[in-house]
């Protein structure tokens, strides 16, 4: 029986999908591989199911690099994530595939890029797109190979996946569903002044009298702990635990605020005029959103409270991660359990003149990604580019499962085996069709749908303040660029997708389109003069 491990292939440009790679094999080998596949899975002789490791996947919503293992904020206190990192491997150059919940999570769970599904906005749910309704998701892939699968909290966006699809006798996304993600306790009225864009109910932060046990994430962690404590041992399990915080509204109890006294609070590196060297296109991708601009936060004296609230929520959710880790460590299966922790995207706290996500800079794209468990080196870091897209093939490989030809990620197993091993393919993040950010170890290239671009030397400019392509029409004045800079642009450009699917049917919420006569936000043409910074 043939077993093809996609981890053994070279780092191809991103437009070379697994299917395209497979089609490049000799015909007899390709036909044999496809003939022995089931549900798009390339199968082979498999080890005894019971010997396979358990997987606990912990997802945290809107968590940027403000965690101790990444050092994004000098004050942050995340002892549980620090403990996990000390037990395993932290990818310090990991990036999401979309700076928005639904497309990012869809990409991770299906192994396909937004450009390959047309999922760019908060809708639709992938199963409602006829072309992709039968995609095998990550939990389903494990279920097909003998795993018990459980999902609690926010793994898919909103309530996606929880309802039985038409024609199904049962919900086929996983075996067991836990509680949905929720804010939990809320104050009787908003704690901050009315915000622009309709005073959205989620735009709020601060503390009010309530208990940690009243929060939605506490309930999700309690469910996860109960599942681990009572887990049968007849088969391995794949447990997905998704936490809501630090997504807005950023509410936490007073004890978490006490960790960050206002008088000693370190503010993020916010540079006045930081958007002076970025094109108008950089504004279009977050054109009209409920998240306040930095100017509003400063005028209403809300920037410091937001930063403090975000940090407090990060520390609270870290404590819930700690509860799950404690349950794993006291479990009789602790030595055979792999833990992976990730966030769907980052979050701006005033940097680049905005709060929220929906950008292609480090604040939105860089995410925590930590692996720990059997076969994973302890206390190590890897600065090679990594993508959330890579989790599907990586976890499959670590569990001894065969690959799935639908996936476009590349396994991180070579870097887990050797954290210094070079990885040719950079990380790409997409926000609506045509807008991409591409990162390797040194450079970040951003190209917008109208061809306008930005380039940052992340080695000398880690906060991405200095756009090296300022006032340089893209490739029309190549001679103005240094040789090294031009070569970096050339190298990264080859990873732009050759084709991009248009918006999937039912797409809505935070949708930007480039049409012949300009950019359109939510079907309304953008007028540059309307820019509010």
Model-identified regions with their sequence ranges:
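Bacterial N-terminal signal peptides
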Residues: 23-37
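Hydrophobic alpha-helical transmembrane segments of integral membrane proteins
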Residues: 22-23, 364
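Short, charged, surface-exposed hinge/linker loops at domain edges
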Residues: 505-520
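N-terminal secretory signal peptides that target proteins for export/translocation
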Residues: 1-20
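Formylglycine-dependent sulfatase
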Residues: 30, 39-448, 453, 462-494, ...
């Amino acid at each position: 029986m043939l077993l093809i491990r996609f981890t053994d292939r070279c780092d191809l440009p991103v437009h070379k999908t697994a299917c395209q790679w497979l089609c490049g094999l000799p015909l007899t080998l390709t036909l044999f591989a496809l003939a022995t596949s089931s549900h798009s899975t390339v199968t082979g002789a498999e080890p005894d199911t019971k010997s396979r490791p358990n997987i606990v996947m912990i997802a945290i919503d809107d968590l940027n690099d403000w965690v101790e293992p990444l050092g994004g904020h000098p004050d942050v206190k995340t002892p549980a994530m620090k403990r996990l990192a000390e037990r395993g491997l932290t990818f310090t150059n990991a990036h999401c595939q979309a700076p928005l919940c639904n497309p990012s999570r869809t990409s991770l769970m299906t192994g396909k890029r937004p450009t390959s599904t047309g999922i760019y906005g908060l809708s639709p749910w992938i199963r409602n797109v006829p072309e992709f309704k039968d995609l095998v998701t990550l939990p389903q892939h494990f279920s097909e190979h003998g795993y018990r699968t459980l999902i609690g909290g926010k793994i898919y966006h909103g309530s996606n996946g929880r309802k039985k699809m038409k024609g199904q006798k049962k919900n086929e996304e996983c075996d067991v569903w836990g509680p949905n993600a929720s804010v939990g306790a809320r104050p009787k009225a908003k704690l901050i002044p009315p915000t622009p864009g309709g005073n959205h109910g989620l735009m709020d932060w601060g503390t009010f009298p309530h208990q940690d046990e009243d929060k939605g994430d506490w309930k999700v962690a309690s469910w996860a702990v109960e599942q681990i404590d009572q887990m049968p041992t007849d088969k391995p399990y794949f447990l997905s635990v998704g936490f809501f915080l630090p997504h807005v509204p950023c509410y936490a109890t007073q004890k978490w605020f006490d960790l960050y006294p206002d008088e000693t609070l370190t503010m993020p590196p916010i540079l006045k005029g930081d958007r002076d060297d970025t094109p108008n296109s950089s504004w279009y991708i977050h054109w009209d959103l409920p998240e306040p601009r930095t100017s509003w936060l400063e005028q209403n004296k809300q920037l410091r409270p937001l930063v403090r609230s975000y940090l407090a929520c990060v520390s609270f959710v870290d404590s819930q991660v700690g509860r799950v880790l404690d349950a794993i460590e006291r479990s009789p299966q602790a030595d055979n359990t792999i833990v992976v922790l990730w966030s769907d995207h980052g979050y701006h706290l005033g940097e680049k003149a905005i709060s929220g996500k929906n950008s292609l800079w480090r604040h939105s794209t860089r995410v925590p990604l930590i692996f720990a468990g059997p076969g994973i080196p302890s206390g190590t870091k890897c600065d090679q580019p990594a993508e959330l897209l890579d989790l599907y093939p990586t976890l499959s490989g670590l569990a001894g499962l065969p690959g799935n030809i639908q996936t476009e990620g590349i396994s991180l197993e070579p870097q887990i085996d050797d954290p210094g091993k070079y990885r040719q393919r950079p990380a790409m993040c997409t926000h609506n069709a045509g807008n991409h950010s591409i990162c390797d170890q040194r450079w970040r290239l951003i190209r917008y749908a109208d061809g306008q671009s930005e380039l940052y030397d992340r080695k000398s400019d880690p906060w991405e303040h200095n756009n090296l392509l300022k006032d340089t029409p893209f490739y029309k004045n190549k001679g103005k660029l240094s040789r090294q800079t031009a070569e970096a642009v050339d190298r990264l450009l080859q990873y732009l997708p050759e084709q991009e699917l248009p918006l999937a049917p039912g797409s809505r919420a935070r949708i930007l389109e480039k049409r012949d006569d300009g950019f359109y936000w939510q079907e309304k043409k953008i007028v540059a003069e309307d820019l509010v910074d």
